[in-house]
Amino acid sequence: MSAATACASPAAARPPLHIPLRSPPSAAHLPSAAASRRASSAACRCTASASASASPSTWDWTRWTRHFADVDQAESYASLLKFQLEEAVDNEDFAEASKLKKAILEATGNDAVAQVMSELKTAIEEQRYQDASRLTKLARTNLVGWWVGYAKDTDDSIGRIVRISPGVGRYVAKSFSPRQLVTASSGTPLFEIFLVRDDDETYTMKVVHMRPTKGTSSASSVSSATAESPAKEENESSLESSAISEGITDEANTDTTLKGDEDVEDKEQDVGNAKDSSVEGLKSVLNFFKSRIPEFKVQVINVDVSEEAELASDSSEELVQDDVKSTSENSLEDSTTEELQQDDVPDGDSDSAEDSKSPEMKLFISGVVHNKEDAGAKSYVRVPAEINNLEKDSFELYIPGKGSDRDLADTKAAKQKVADMAAKLASELMPSDVAKALWGTTKSSSKINKEVQELLKLTLSKARVKLTENTIFNRIITDSNGSDPFSGLYVGAFSPYGPEVVQLRRKFGHWNSTDEVEFFEYVEAVKLTGDLSVPAGQITFRAKIGKGKRLENRGAYPEEFGVIASYKGQGRIAQPGFKNPRWVDGELLVLNGKSTIPHLGGAELGFLYSVPEQSFLVLFDRLKLPE
């Protein structure tokens, strides 16, 4: 049997690994250090023989597939040895630990990525910058870091935040939704870049896209449940459900897992413990605005980071704070909400028909709740991909054949359908007057059924990990120390469909194109992840922050708000599909992050959109990306 044939069956060269999914292997099933060394030596000989038979630059897809399997098995084997090493150290068996360290080095001896990163670190420490530059060019180490990707030449409103990090034999790219970033999730596999070192000390890269396998995603189960359920709504809802189902069944969504009753009980207990202080703080704020604004009204939306949030309001006078879980059960009402509704709703204002005609000023607060992450195991299949136009801070990911999955016209029609439904659903999840001001939509007479709502939310969430044929990635460069409030990443909620990430930057210039312009210093916030109203890559708000631009806010806001500075600015609103975008007056608030008011605690920035007859306050928490 030739060396190449031997490598085609890596299981014959190494003992099979049986690693439990939920618990580490017991000591009785762990291989000894001697067996580990024999197995890793066999693996090294197999890889070396295969490398000698042909240069990696000439490998076909079949040969690369065998290499992928070898790397996967080597990674699993090294993980097993590391677990055994930890156990040996805990048992103070240092002789066995020393043997295991050598076995780990042998098992990962051909890890080109680990070798390159080690050599690069040494070169930088020794100030050998020419060598470091050479390694960067040969092994593409500059791919490591945080990136934001946007679809090329297509109408794509959702940006993708991606982290590329060194792995065993490859660079691993994972996509992160805003919720996953806030909850420190492990992310969703997106693509991989395998690296092989040639005999002439050059490197060969192979890029693969991690495509979710059909039939294993939550999307499939949700679509199936919808199709089998009895038709209880109008035909329009059935058609909407079918249209969305067809648009999401071919991709995986790792963010749709069910929460148990234990999480709900823990949350209710936490709310009860903080009830007294938070309720009193919010009441004082409401009383403050009521004393200064005639017939003041306030509504609060709570956007849950771990699940999509749903706002149910029967009257525009009610203060609502509902956390809606993505399950088939009914919404669970927060106990704090009930007390606030009873105490703070003005008498005689329960008529919703009269409210729709009322011209009073109202304030709508959008906040973010940080709950734990739910993870779901998914399976993926590797398909060929390419990286083109690689620069220092940008590159293009190309997936051959991805554009032919569907007809372009059908894709645009499906996106327009989703946008129209999102606008319709927003009028049900948000107060109708707020939805009309921010989304340009009114409440529909036909109600969207629960299944369609879940599918729509699933579609919007899944879009963050779905790649088109061509995706442009730009490096995310942020202020590392986070001392400047007008520079860096923030997470906030602009709609009931979940949080979004914005990047703030200081700039100097002007906001119009007339000849007589005034140059000034300002800050602008660009959406890294967008929605169907204002897409990713667009400026969502801006404010003048130069000398003399700070407003006198003494007494303008209650102390419970924690406002330490405020600046005049402009916010951008638009209808779904970024139709009819326009700027409205606004105010940028710098907060101390110590407020005891619900939804304000921890927030460091806020932007107040002044829409006619409606003020919309978006709160932002600082987001620090892991190094």
From Swiss-Prot:
Transit peptide: 1-45
GO BP annotations, alphabetical order: response to singlet oxygen; singlet oxygen-mediated programmed cell death
Keywords: Chloroplast, Plastid, Stress response, Transit peptide
Top-level taxon of origin: Eukaryota
Region Disordered, annotated ranges: 1-34, 212-277, 308-359
Keyword Flavoprotein listed: no
KW DNA-binding (keyword) present: no
Entry's localization field: Plastid, Chloroplast
Chain intervals with Low complexity compositional bias: 217-229
Compositional bias segments (type: Acidic residues): 308-321, 331-353
GO cellular component, one term: chloroplast
PANTHER family, per the entry: PROTEIN EXECUTER 1, CHLOROPLASTIC, PROTEIN EXECUTER 2, CHLOROPLASTIC
Physiological role: Together with EX1, enables higher plants to perceive singlet oxygen as a stress signal in plastid that activates a genetically determined nuclear stress response program which triggers a programmed cell death (PCD). This transfer of singlet oxygen-induced stress-related signals from the plastid to the nucleus that triggers genetically controlled PCD pathway is unique to photosynthetic eukaryotes and operates under mild stress conditions, impeding photosystem II (PSII) without causing photooxidative damage of the plant.
Name of the protein described by the UniProt record: Protein EXECUTER 2, chloroplastic
Organism: Oryza sativa subsp. japonica
Lineage, broadest ranks: Eukaryota, Viridiplantae, Streptophyta, Embryophyta, Tracheophyta
Gene: EX2
